[in-house]
UniProtKB/Swiss-Prot annotation:
UniProt keyword annotations, A-Z: Aminoacyl-tRNA synthetase, ATP-binding, Cytoplasm, Ligase, Magnesium, Metal-binding, Nucleotide-binding, Protein biosynthesis
Any one cellular-component term (Gene Ontology): cytosol
Organism the protein comes from: Pelotomaculum thermopropionicum (strain DSM 13744 / JCM 10971 / SI)
Record's protein name: Lysine--tRNA ligase
Source organism superkingdom: Bacteria
Entry-linked PROSITE patterns: AA_TRNA_LIGASE_II (PS50862)
Binding, Mg(2+) 1: E416, E423
Localisation: Cytoplasm
Amino acid sequence: MAQKKKEELSDLIEASGREEDLNELMRVRREKLAELRDKGIEPYGGRFERTHTARYILDNFVEMENRPVVIAGRIMSRRGMGKATFAHIQDGTGQIQIYVRLNDVGPESYELFGRLDIGDIIGVQGSVFKTRMGEITVAAESFKILSKSLRPLPEKWHGLRDVELRYRQRYVDLIVNPEVKEVFETRSKIIRACRNFLDGKGFLEVETPMMQVIPGGAAARPFITHHNALDMDLYLRIAPELYLKRLLVGGFEKVYEINRNFRNEGISTKHNPEFTMLELYQAYADYTDMMNLTEELISAVAVEALGTTKIEYQGTEIDLAPPWPRIPMLETIKVHAGLDFGALKSAEEAFKAVEQAGIGLELDPSDSWGTIVNKVFEEVVEPKLIQPTFVVDYPVEISPLAKRKAEDPELTYRFELFIYGREIANAFSELNDPIDQKGRFLKQVEKRKAGDEEAHMMDEDYINALEYGMPPAGGLGIGIDRLVMLLTNSASIRDVILFPLMKPRE
């Protein structure tokens, strides 16, 4: 009777979330751990050989009925009925019910099973049957404790109240929220589909340095580290671009890399300082080829990962089937903001026009024409681009690595892809003129000296590489995390990164 009251107290404590109650429950579980060892039972077992998974049994009942099986998993629920107990155990494929009966396992084992807690991991040997309620179940003949859980699983894990804790303790989130696990399984499918697509197109996957002497390839503030043996500062890469283009100089014609980038910037629903990018380069191609490749790749990935190009994101239906609209940047601004930057060719004129338009956009008097154009676009146009849209022909001031347009040198052969008001991809016809490239780098250096910490640094070795001759090429970067957000209907980038960066608790 005393033992029963103790277990009732344990269940009562488990239902509450107070810290003192949690500590008491953990104390009770540690007592159970000690009891197991006193009985000569090792609560943290070694290798355990299963014959089947939960999903296989559930999907193949006709084949599996009355057959012997050995399964393993975590106890997720339990209900006792005197001389018999039903429980659900969860493995990597799903949950299945087990039936433990006193007459089948014996008094000692049945008493031991009654002392197990939700969260404990066990192995079960038995046979498959279906209950009167129609649930596929494994009737246990024996079981083995594989791992004793000392912390109770939270009962109320859903909802915004627990969202930060879910990110901090993703391991618990994955246990109790199957839909979260599905997101990361889909993420894996998406990345695999990207590789399959590019491999099929003849691209070669490569790896380039994560620590760089000079960070380049993007406008971003880098993380700095120090190499003790060489006594020199290094930068975590903000992009692999300049190294991948060095490979084009070396004779590789189609290369890609899927890897991490690091940018010392703010955190939001769209930004994490550590993120995954797909970047690729193709010799003898241009940004039109990259647009064709982008819409073909993303639609193919959607079909391989989800089975369709029609998805729903945050209540909005989005059709990823190509072709996608291709609209010049200045034209989109003219349509949505009423500003004709094509007729405003100086920064002063552009600045004055934006102020008179009453957009409510804060500009810096030092902003260049291209910077003003981009700020207006991001503020007014970007949120309205819901269906997949290529915005093309960006100002040269904000595109230091893109080739100038022959018919208008103030613009470049560059595009960005927007879906649901978010940038998903960035691409251009690559600048392969070493003299023009050096001149643009020098302008970026001037910006850095003026206080712009995100401006590009001079990379003399990259200029040296271009001087050997780089073939004309198209380049493309796709944010894998944002693509996964889109294809899994996830509102925040933290929902698609297993362990997002979190500020430590005090």
